[in-house]
Design a protein with these regions (language model features):
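Bacterial N-terminal signal peptides that target proteins for export
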Residues: 2-12
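Catalytic cores of secreted/periplasmic lytic hydrolases that degrade extracellular macromolecules
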Residues: 2, 23, 27-213
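Bacterial N-terminal signal peptides
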Residues: 12-22
Length: 213
């Protein structure tokens, strides 16, 4: 009798251990499935670049550089890296959107290949003062000064009188932007900064491409 009791006790214990094992396995499996579900959920949507001139850019210098080289594989890589960093720094100082300024530079200079009135030696990255062959654009003494002049000109377009410049003025045409704040976003640059009515749309397309980097 006692041996039968021991047998049934051992059998019961074995059943309980087996069930416990199945429970643990089931829980582990469920946990793993939950982790997979969590992993497969879409990540937060990539932040969109603002089209407002007086705003913060979201791309770092490395992303700007990669965008430039993707669009211009034969471009000067060292110069592209340097100018990307300059745009980040100068824009942060004045509160101007560095993404907008950088793609505008790409559009205006054909990715630093130039080819119109403005020539490479001028350090003019946005066509400042370029009207005709008698007025082929302003010349700046360094890349940094040229980038700063570009940012300051955007500042004149994108901000009002109550927002002063932080750096010393190097843009000779800053004072000619009237009224101040005439183009708060890229679309306002069409017909103002450039005669091209599609100018804002062209910048918009470039920004959409930059968002992928």
């Amino acid at each position: 009798m006692k041996s039968k009791q021991n047998f049934f006790l051992k059998l019961l214990a074995a059943i309980l251990i087996c069930e416990a094992g199945l429970f643990v396995t089931s829980c582990s499996t469920a946990r793993n499935l939950n982790e997979l579900d969590s992993f497969s959920e879409p990540q937060e949507e990539q932040k969109k670049i603002l089209r407002t001139i007086y705003s913060a850019g979201i791309k770092n210098a490395e992303s700007l550089y990669k965008f430039f080289i993707a669009k211009c594989p034969d471009g000067n890589k060292a110069k592209a890296k340097k100018i990307a960093k300059l745009y980040i720094t100068e824009c942060q100082t004045e509160g101007i959107n560095s993404d907008i300024a950088f793609v505008q530079m790409c559009l205006e200079t054909n990715y630093l290949r130039y080819g119109n009135l403005v020539t490479k030696d001028k350090n003019n990255f946005c066509g400042l003062g370029a009207i005709d062959k008698n007025n082929p654009g302003l010349k700046f003494k360094s890349m940094k000064e040229g980038v700063r002049a570009h940012i300051q000109h955007l500042h004149a377009y994108g901000t009002t009188e109550d927002i002063p410049l932080k750096n010393e003025l190097v843009d000779p045409r800053y004072k000619f932007v009237k009224p101040r704040g005439k183009a708060t976003d890229i679309f306002g640059l069409a017909g103002t900064w450039a005669a091209d009515k599609e100018y804002g749309a062209k910048l918009d397309r470039l920004l959409s491409e930059l968002e992928e980097f």
